[in-house]
Amino acid sequence: MKIETIEIRHYRIALDPPFHAAWDPNPRRTFTNTIVCVRAGDYEGVGSGDAMLGFAGHEHLFIGHDPFAIERHVRLLDNLQFHYGRCWPLEVALWDLMGQVAGQPVWKLLGGRTSRVPLYASCGERKPAAARADSAKQLKALGYPALKIRFHDADIRQDIAVVAAAREAIGPDMHILVDANQGWQMPWDASAPWDFKTALWAADALADLGVFWLEEPLHRHDYEGLAELRRRAKLRIAGGEGNREYADLRRYLKHGSFDVYQPDVVWCTGVLRARQLAGEVQAASCIYTPHTWGDGLVLLANLHVCAALSTAPFAEFPYDPPNWTPERRDFILPAPLLPSGPGYIDLPDAPGLGVTIDWDKLEAFRIEAGTMKSN
């Protein structure tokens, strides 16, 4: 069997009302998706994520080769990432294709640890304390074992007050995670990230509120600073979602930068490297639970990796109604991904990622290019 075609398609929907992502100073009035489709014989694999910038013209590096030669393909994708954008959605599509051929879900191909993944509700917008407290109570009632709250107020004390209100609303028996979003910025954001003392002050204040982890409290390349913060903090330090190089992620391990490692399979590692890194992370008695914020295919790819590899207490499930719902998030899927029960999702035994794209349905949303819009 040989790879016959690779096709990249872009789609966009309008968001009305807009989604106010805590990490983006501009309201998001559209949501753009890129799908990579790989075909071999009667089989089709799909993946999504970044816009695959720079990939056009390099299809010949893969066409005509065995889709199961994944080590080779990952090396080439690593090369392309150095010269262009992040092309890991192609590797996800290849795993989906391999699963279709083998008649097995990706989570079984990777090890088959379990089909059930516990979820935490990942909120994306900053809300006033009372509104976030109400949201937290609703999420607790739905059975989520944890929720993530985003920071980014100009006055960090206001962010702390939101967490305090949520803790008072839900009590001590639901975990709160906090994402400071200081590791990277949008292209149009010129603000400076926290310094070490700000991060340490926040960590101490959040520890007093029983917060489970503080995510991305410093710039993503401050390996030593993150390690020192972890040493001094009274709560877990999390991060690593977007470092492009596998060597960067192993450098975190060398320095002991994190308690919780979160490399996203479509942002920085791909699936094969995720398997390698998860083993190292968990051997170091740390938590491996990937970041996942995007569409349903991105979520599925990370959930399959979690099911196969992660012993984490929960995995990320982007959910912050009314402006970020499964229906918006998963518009490229035939149906949105929903929890199977209170605070968990059961992955199917269907081959590959377990979904079939309805290309005809998506045609109304198709666009020529998948680059981000600044407003």
Residue ranges: model-predicted function:
Residues M1-P18, P25-P27, F31-N33, G41, ...:
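Flexible C-terminal active-site loop/helix
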Residues I3, L90, G103, L147, ...:
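Conserved, mostly hydrophobic/aromatic
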Residues E91-R126, D173:
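Glycine-rich, aromatic-flanked loop segments that form ligand/cofactor-binding clefts
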Residues G49, A121-C123, I149-F151, M174, ...:
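A cross-domain feature marking catalytic cores of carbohydrate-active enzymes
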Residues H65, A69-R72, G210, H219-A238, ...:
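Shared catalytic-loop signature of beta/alpha-barrel
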Residues R116-A233:
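Metal-dependent enolase-superfamily TIM-barrel catalytic cores that perform enediolate-based chemistry
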